[in-house]
């Protein structure tokens, strides 16, 4: 573990007590975990991916993965908010103008600025990398018009990395990314999140109507959005989402293991549930799911960091693998928890609901498997 990784892991632990304490309320009240995000900002976790020269920790994919898995064990809603913040931060650091980076990255490093992505649109569904919305020039910058379907931290973030088709785009791949301030005129949140799980991540539709942004707020060159999504957003999001899934699975495993070890049968002379062979079998299956998915995640990170030309296939696959491993572990944990797991809100029941999101979060598990199947057959992915 690197020094940066050790530092950020310890910093994440410092906020863990607050986050874990709030998790049930965040879920029950379906409220944004503002206290948790403030705590993470105070201990500099939000600046994990900010380069050192801008006051951040200079962390990378491995550090991000560890922090997100740890956060997800306490509160998956909070972990999802932080994941999308990390993705937005990575884009700003990689593609922002010098002026924009100097203005924003130190504030992010200090935990004073929360950002997020605004990619998904009704017109392209799970294929978020193909926006149908449009940017048009206004003389000194651009007007943005877009309908976004699922924006994490909608109405709560300080800025949004927004995707649209590029000016004069002729293909869906010709897209552009812009940084939009939360105070921008014409930016509107439509409704509130009412999903099955991740109840506190404030994922809601947003509308941009003639939102004016200056040229300095375009992230990358004209028509470079698709490339940025592949090179910057996809690795961070896929690996981060996989880490959140494994954090959820680890929490479920721990809850179930604690339950079966403590549960005694009075009619059987105090025998523990853990002594039943079927219980041991389910425990073994959970261990195998967790360990195999974690090994795949570690290998994916290693290949991505080293620049392995085959890394993209693993980046595509890891979110699907971790999502399925999480569902498998959580399902077994619910079985081991018995009626108490289903009847007690805020514990395993909450984790069960939170685990469902990864499979339908774009790119969905089905879309990712479609990509992998095409790659295995030597067919074009898009």
Language-model region placement:
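Residue-level recognition of alpha-helical structural elements
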Residues: 4, 8, 29-33, 60, ...
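C-terminal helix-coil-helix/basic helical segment that borders enzyme active sites and/or dimer interfaces
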Residues: 20-28, 290-321, 334-342
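Glycine-rich flavin
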Residues: 32-42, 46-152
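A short core secondary-structure module
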Residues: 147-188
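Glycine-rich phosphate/pyrophosphate-binding beta-alpha loops
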Residues: 149-154, 234-240, 358-361
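Glycine-rich beta->alpha junctions and the first turn(s) of the following alpha-helix
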Residues: 193-289
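Amphipathic alpha-helices that form helix-helix packing interfaces
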Residues: 242, 249, 256, 286, ...
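Glycine-rich phosphate/cofactor-binding loops in nucleotide/flavin-utilizing enzymes
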Residues: 339-382
């Amino acid at each position: 573990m690197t020094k940066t990784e050790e530092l950020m892991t310890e910093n994440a632990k410092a906020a863990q007590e607050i986050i874990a304490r709030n998790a049930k309320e965040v879920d029950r009240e379906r409220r944004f975990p503002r206290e948790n995000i403030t705590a993470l900002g105070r201990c500099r976790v939000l600046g994990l991916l900010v380069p050192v020269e801008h006051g951040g920790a200079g962390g990378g994919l491995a550090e991000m993965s560890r922090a997100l898995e740890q956060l997800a064990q306490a509160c998956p809603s909070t972990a999802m908010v932080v994941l999308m913040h990390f993705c937005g931060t990575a884009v700003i650091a990689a593609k922002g103008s010098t002026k924009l980076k100097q203005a924003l990255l130190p504030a992010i490093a200090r935990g004073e600025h929360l950002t997020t992505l605004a990619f998904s649109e009704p017109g392209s569904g799970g294929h978020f990398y193909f926006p149908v919305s449009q940017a048009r020039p206004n003389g000194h910058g651009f007007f943005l018009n877009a309908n976004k379907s699922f924006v994490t931290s909608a109405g709560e973030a300080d800025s949004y990395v927004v995707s649209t088709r590029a000016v004069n785009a002729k293909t869906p791949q010709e897209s552009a990314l812009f940084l939009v301030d939360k105070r921008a005129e014409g930016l509107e949140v439509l409704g509130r999140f009412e999903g099955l799980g991740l109840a506190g991540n404030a994922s809601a539709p947003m509308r941009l109507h003639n939102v004016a942004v200056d040229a300095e707020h375009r992230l990358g060159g004209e028509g470079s959005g698709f490339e940025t999504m592949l090179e910057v957003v996809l690795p961070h999001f896929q690996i981060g989402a996989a880490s959140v899934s494994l954090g959820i699975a680890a929490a479920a495993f721990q809850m179930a293991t604690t339950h079966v070890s403590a549960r005694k049968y009075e009619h059987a002379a105090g025998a523990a549930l853990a002594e039943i062979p079927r219980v041991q079998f389910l425990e073994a299956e959970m261990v195998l799911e967790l360990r195999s998915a974690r090994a795949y995640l570690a290998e994916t990170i290693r290949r991505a960091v080293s620049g392995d030309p085959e890394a993209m296939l693993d980046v595509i696959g890891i979110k699907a693998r971790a999502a399925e491993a999480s569902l498998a572990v959580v399902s077994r944990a619910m079985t081991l928890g018995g009626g108490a797991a289903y009847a007690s809100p805020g514990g395993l029941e909450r984790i069960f609901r939170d685990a469902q999101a990864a499979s339908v979060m774009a790119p969905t598990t089905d879309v990712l498997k479609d990509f992998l199947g095409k790659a295995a057959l030597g067919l074009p992915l898009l």
